[in-house]
């Protein structure tokens, strides 16, 4: 991931202004430590901090067309860039090997109506010197972060992270996913318009082969890299499938020719935590060289302020899950790895969180998946991107591939729901799709096993330790006055209050606090899903452990799953509150590296 900053229409064109913009851009240097570039045309500035993944020797930014009348800065990976290059080979002279350079000929050919032709994740700004207009766009789901604001002189500021613009803007906000901003048209408009966005319940039958093929394609296209890469592996279903598919197809890729097909697996957790044990088992099956990173509760507590600074949030669940990932990312980068694949998005698309078990019907189930996918940019996408970008590590998420999303979200939700009578547990559609008797991807007991929420999976003592620590940092008197001190999104417990104090010190602007989502949550639910169960309304802890069936789920899941692994038929769409459920909150903090840079067991 790179970092971009654009200041457009500034009243001040001076060298001092240029120096100030460059200084602001350097606040994003952690995202792109490999190179920096700055373009200026009168009061328009486009800056980029580059993390070189594709074409590291020739892809420095800003990017230009042949006569330098169009300039682009981008943070993105365009997986169909080779196809687009062939399309424009006779019309456009490419000057770099950067995948993002294809944005320029697309704009020259189609104007601003080309964004949906990009297959990948991105946040970019394009300036056209001929018309003195500009456009900016963000990918469909918001995998790559982006913010937009207005300076006191009326200039538009656009940045990968708000830390580069918050001190210069009188107001700013999240640049919405799936949108583009056009100075010519005078504002934002949505370019991503999938059918599922209307939240109408689909009726397409489950097609396991179609689902499997869409996911395999999503993984394979993300193996596009010119640097050492890996796959996060926590031992849960989603990260294990990402690792298994990578293992199966890596040998056929250009990446294998460059870095070899040997896989190294990494996992982080407290000593004896569920993720360490589960990841070790998956790594043994896949034949990886396994590496374990251990951290202590104190290590995590010491990192909290840095995590909040980089994540730019005070959301409790995000901070809990980000901290181990943040610690691990530093170790991964130190081994020479610059890109990893991860399993974010599966639980939102397929209803894999613990609480989905209690959905009263398929209509509510589907609406909740829609709400969750739409909100990913404020939660798991934000966490995965920023916690790793803090150390110049890029995360790619195949579950959030546009084609895979279309397949998953067009399926009749009855197939996704738990049904004990038919042997269907959560994410059964994905498990069944990869249950290949002849050429198994994973053993059945792994394929059909419950997975913890990530912050629980790295070790239950992590959450308990956070609660105990913050209990000592925030007094009862402070909590009594919480609504007066923080009238917007008032903290409901001491852990939330502690995170909020740090956030407000780092980002004191009203606009900053309004970028953070709020509302009650249970096991990562949206506020709307709280209405499903009366007892949930009184909870102030988002942990999945508060779901009644969580404690018994692991014990019963394997027995149920093996007995029903091959079950077929139609779901009745009803949820049974006493049966096993699964969650895979952040899909792994672990890593499978496709090169030989790391060997043996290491401890953080």
UniProtKB/Swiss-Prot annotation:
Pathway entry: Amino-acid biosynthesis; L-asparagine biosynthesis
A Pfam family it matches: Asn_synthase
Record domain Asparagine synthetase: where: 211-451
Keywords linked to the UniProt accession: Amino-acid biosynthesis, Asparagine biosynthesis, ATP-binding, Glutamine amidotransferase, Ligase, Nucleotide-binding
Active site: 2 (nucleophile)
Positions contributing to L-glutamine binding: 50-54, 75-77, 99
Matching SUPFAM superfamilies: Adenine nucleotide alpha hydrolases-like, N-terminal nucleophile aminohydrolases (Ntn hydrolases)
A cellular-component GO term for this protein: cytosol
GO molecular function: asparagine synthase (glutamine-hydrolyzing) activity; ATP binding
Catalytic activity of the protein: L-aspartate + L-glutamine + ATP + H2O = L-asparagine + L-glutamate + AMP + diphosphate + H(+)
EC number: 6.3.5.4
Site (Important for beta-aspartyl-AMP intermediate formation): 344
Any GO BP: asparagine biosynthetic process
Chain positions recorded as ATP binding sites: 232, 268, 342-343
Function field: Essential for nitrogen assimilation, distribution and remobilization within the plant via the phloem.
Protein name, entry field: Asparagine synthetase [glutamine-hydrolyzing] 1
Annotated source species: Oryza sativa subsp. japonica
Lineage, highest ranks first: Eukaryota, Viridiplantae, Streptophyta, Embryophyta, Tracheophyta
């Amino acid at each position: 991931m790179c970092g971009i900053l654009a200041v457009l229409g500034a009243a001040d064109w001076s060298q001092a202004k240029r120096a100030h913009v460059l200084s602001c851009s350097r606040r994003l240097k952690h995202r792109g430590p490999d190179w920096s570039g700055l373009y200026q045309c009168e009061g328009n500035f486009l800056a980029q901090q580059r993390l070189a993944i594709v074409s590291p020797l020739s892809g420095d930014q800003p990017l230009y067309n042949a006569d330098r009348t169009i300039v682009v800065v981008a943070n993105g990976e365009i997986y169909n860039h080779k196809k687009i290059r062939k399309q424009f080979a006779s019309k456009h002279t490419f000057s770099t090997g950067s995948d993002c350079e294809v944005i320029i000929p697309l704009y020259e050919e189609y104007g601003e109506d080309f964004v949906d032709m990009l297959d990948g994740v991105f946040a970019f700004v394009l300036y056209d010197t001929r018309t003195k207009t500009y456009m900016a766009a963000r990918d469909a789901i918001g995998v790559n972060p982006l913010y937009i604001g207005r300076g006191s002189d009326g200039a538009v500021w656009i940045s990968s992270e708000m830390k580069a613009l918050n001190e210069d803007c009188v107001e700013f906000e999240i640049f919405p996913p799936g949108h583009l901003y056009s100075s010519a048209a005078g504002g934002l408009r949505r370019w991503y318009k999938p059918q599922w966005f209307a939240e109408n319940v689909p009726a397409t039958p489950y097609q396991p082969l179609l689902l499997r093929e869409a996911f395999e394609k999503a993984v394979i296209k993300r193996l596009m890299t010119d640097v050492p890469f890996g796959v996060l592996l926590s031992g849960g279903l989603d990260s294990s499938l990402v690792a298994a598919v990578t293992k199966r197809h890596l040998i056929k890729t250009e990446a294998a020719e460059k870095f070899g097909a040997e896989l190294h697996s990494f996992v982080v957790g407290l000593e004896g935590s569920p993720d360490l044990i589960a990841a070790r088992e998956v790594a043994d099956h896949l034949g990886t060289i396994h590496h374990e990173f251990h951290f202590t509760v104190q290590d995590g507590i010491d990192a909290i302020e840095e995590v909040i600074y980089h994540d730019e949030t005070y959301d409790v669940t995000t901070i809990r899950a980000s901290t181990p990932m943040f610690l691990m990312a530093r170790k991964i980068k130190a081994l020479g790895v610059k890109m990893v694949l991860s399993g974010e998005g599966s639980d939102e698309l397929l209803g894999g969180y613990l609480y989905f078990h209690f959905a009263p019907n398929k209509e509510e189930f589907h609406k909740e998946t829609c709400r969750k996918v739409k909100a990913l940019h404020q939660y798991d996408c934000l966490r995965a991107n920023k916690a790793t970008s803090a150390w110049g590590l890029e995360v790619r998420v195949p579950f959030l591939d546009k084609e895979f999303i279309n397949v998953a979200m067009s399926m009749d939700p009855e197939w996704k729901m738990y049904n004990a009578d038919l042997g269907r547990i959560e994410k059964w559609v994905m498990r069944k799709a990869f249950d290949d008797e002849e050429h198994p991807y994973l053993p059945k007991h792994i394929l059909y096993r419950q997975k913890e929420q990530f912050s629980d999976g790295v070790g239950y003592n992590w959450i308990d330790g956070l609660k105990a620590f913050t209990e000592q940092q925030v007094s009862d008197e402070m909590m009594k006055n919480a609504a007066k001190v923080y009238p917007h999104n008032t903290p409901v417990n001491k852990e939330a209050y502690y995170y909020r104090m740090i956030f407000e010190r780092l980002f004191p602007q009203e606009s900053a606090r309004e970028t953070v989502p709020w509302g009650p949550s249970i096991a990562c639910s949206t506020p709307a899903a709280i209405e499903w169960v009366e007892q949930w309304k009184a909870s102030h802890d988002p942990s999945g452990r508060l779901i009644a069936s969580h404690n018994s789920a692991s014990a019963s899941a394997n027995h149920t799953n093996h007995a029903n692994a091959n079950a077929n038929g139609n779901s009745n769409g009803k949820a049974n509150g006493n049966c096993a459920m699964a969650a895979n909150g952040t899909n792994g903090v672990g890593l499978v590296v496709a090169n030989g840079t790391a060997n043996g067991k290491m401890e953080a």
